């Protein structure tokens, strides 16, 4: 009886707690997310309501993603600048969620409060087929909710929306107080 417990070390027991494998089957993710969209769609009447509901669910996920990333990161420091927070989202958060960095991060030419994260082929929209009457639907509103929660819980309150432009573009509009704080930090 003792032999079955001492036969060898299990690969599961040898894994580090700080960095668990977070791979999820793409087909399982696609099925789960499409069911989530169908569930939300059955409870709303307009595309705007559906996108708002997906964003709300994304905000719940975003708060948990931030907690998990901060808990796993050794020696991590808290970002104090807007650009650092955006690079954290573009890099670490995107890698944790989708296995790669976002394609592009840009700032609007005419507004210091507005930034864009561009994803040419978002994984979240890959397996969702949208009927013609709902052609404006962008399921990346879920991702926008995640990004909004990560930024807001990190101390950078912002409103994030998803748009169709060069693939999917997440438009991040920070509150004026965030930009004022960033400028004050630059002046030091």
From Swiss-Prot:
Which residue spans traverse the membrane?
none
Subcellular location(s): the record lists: Golgi apparatus, cis-Golgi network; Endoplasmic reticulum
User: Does the keyword Protein biosynthesis feature in the UniProt annotation?
Assistant: no
Name where it mostly resides. Answer: Golgi
InterPro entries named among the record's database cross-references? NO_sig/Golgi_transp_ligand-bd, TRAPP-I_su5, TRAPP_component
Q: What Pfam families does the entry give?
A: TRAPP (PF04051)
Phosphoserine found at:
10
- UniProt superkingdom: Eukaryota
Which SUPFAM superfamilies does the entry link to? Ligand-binding domain in the NO signalling and Golgi transport (SSF111126)
Recite the UniProt keywords alphabetically: Endoplasmic reticulum, ER-Golgi transport, Golgi apparatus, Phosphoprotein, Transport
Q: Name one GO cellular component term.
A: TRAPPII protein complex
Set out the biological process GO terms recorded for this chain's protein: endoplasmic reticulum to Golgi vesicle-mediated transport
Q: What does this protein do?
A: May play a role in vesicular transport from endoplasmic reticulum to Golgi.
Family from the record: Belongs to the TRAPP small subunits family. BET3 subfamily.
Question: How does this chain assemble?
Answer: Component of the multisubunit TRAPP (transport protein particle) complex, which includes at least TRAPPC2, TRAPPC2L, TRAPPC3, TRAPPC3L, TRAPPC4, TRAPPC5, TRAPPC8, TRAPPC9, TRAPPC10, TRAPPC11 and TRAPPC12.
By what name is this protein known? Trafficking protein particle complex subunit 5
Organism expressing this protein natively? Bos taurus (Bovine)
Q: What is the lineage of its organism?
A: Eukaryota, Metazoa, Chordata, Craniata, Vertebrata
